[in-house]
């Protein structure tokens, strides 16, 4: 059984880093990894939704993971999302991830066609078989994937010894309780919705993987510590403050990840490009909201850190 301790804590979802032509930038990718190392996070979740994976080629995703591992190996826990909407490419990415020495691979279910549970289980197990020495995390995000991880499907997947748990991004925190109960002490649940990090942790999640963590890692690290210290009143205040920031990050015409990249430029001096079409980049009309979001992060740090 894998040592699950290495997965506990704050694990930001890694952002795609592009050059001015919209191509993957190795240099900017490495700079973002170093930023996260310097902030003190537990690990990174690479090539997931926040990494714009569904708008990238297999080769793009390989390059990103190679650049991440060149900087992060031995310093951060790395979970590589490898799912594509076909089994062959997913298995290729799984083999590649294992060859680089990632800690775990993860997958969403196949999307568009509504497949029966036995087909989803086969898809996941086939991908896992391509990385036989690597831990496996199931990603439950039914509101986007259109497929929910049911108790019966999770029970079936627990027969796979490489399955270590679930990244749960469904909104009901009761789902976390369900997966914790089914998996027991030998498995881990990651909280997915950033707005309920506190609630998810209290329901049994041992860690969080989130798309807004990267804009404010210090705040999520502080929230994680407050939970460990059982200072739940302050933790609730901080969660409310974080949620206000998330409200700003999602209040623009441009896509949230484009906003976060602009916030990182303002607050951290990091330039990692924009977002890839069909995601909408930040517009000039968005600029006041972007500036307000960046300022709110700075103010919240001053208040809680």
Task: Place the predicted regions along the sequence by residue.
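General structural feature for long, well-ordered alpha-helical segments within catalytic domains
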Residues: 25-28, 32, 60, 64, ...
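Charge-dense, low-complexity intrinsically disordered segments
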Residues: 1, 23, 55, 59, ...
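Catalytic alpha/beta core domains of metabolic enzymes, predominantly
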Residues: 130, 142-243, 249, 253
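Structural motif
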Residues: 2, 36, 97, 155-158, ...
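Active-site beta->alpha loop and helix N-cap motifs at the rims of alpha/beta catalytic domains
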Residues: 3-12, 17-148, 264
């Amino acid at each position: 059984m894998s040592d699950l301790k290495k997965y506990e804590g704050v694990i930001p979802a890694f952002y795609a880093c592009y050059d001015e032509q919209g191509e993957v930038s190795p240099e900017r990718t490495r700079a973002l990894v170093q930023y996260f190392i310097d902030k003190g996070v537990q690990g990174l979740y690479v090539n997931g939704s926040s990494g714009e994976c569904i708008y990238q080629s297999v080769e793009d995703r390989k390059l990103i993971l190679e650049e991440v591992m060149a900087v992060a190996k031995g310093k951060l826990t790395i979970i590589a999302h490898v799912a594509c909407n076909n089994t062959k490419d997913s298995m290729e990415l799984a083999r590649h991830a294992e060859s680089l020495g990632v800690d775990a691979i993860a997958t969403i279910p196949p999307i568009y066609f509504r497949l029966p549970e036995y087909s989803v289980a086969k898809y996941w197990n086939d991908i896992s078989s391509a990385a036989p020495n690597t831990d496996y995390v199931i990603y439950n995000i039914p509101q986007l994937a259109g497929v929910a991880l049911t108790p019966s499907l999770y029970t079936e997947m627990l027969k796979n010894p490489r399955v270590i748990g679930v990244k749960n991004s469904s909104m009901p925190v009761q789902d976390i309780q369900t997966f914790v109960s089914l998996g027991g002490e030998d498995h881990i649940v990651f909280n997915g919705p950033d707005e309920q990090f506190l609630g998810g942790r209290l329901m049994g999640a041992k860690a969080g993987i989130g798309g807004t963590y990267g804009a404010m890692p210090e705040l999520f690290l502080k929230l994680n510590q407050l939970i460990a210290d059982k200072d739940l009143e302050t933790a609730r205040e901080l969660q409310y403050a974080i949620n206000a920031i998330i409200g700003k990050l999602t209040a623009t015409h441009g896509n949230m990840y484009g906003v976060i990249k602009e916030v990182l430029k303002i607050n951290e001096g990091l330039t990692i490009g924009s977002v890839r079409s069909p995601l909408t980049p930040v517009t000039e009309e968005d600029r006041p909201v972007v500036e307000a979001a960046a300022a709110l992060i700075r103010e919240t740090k001053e208040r809680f850190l």
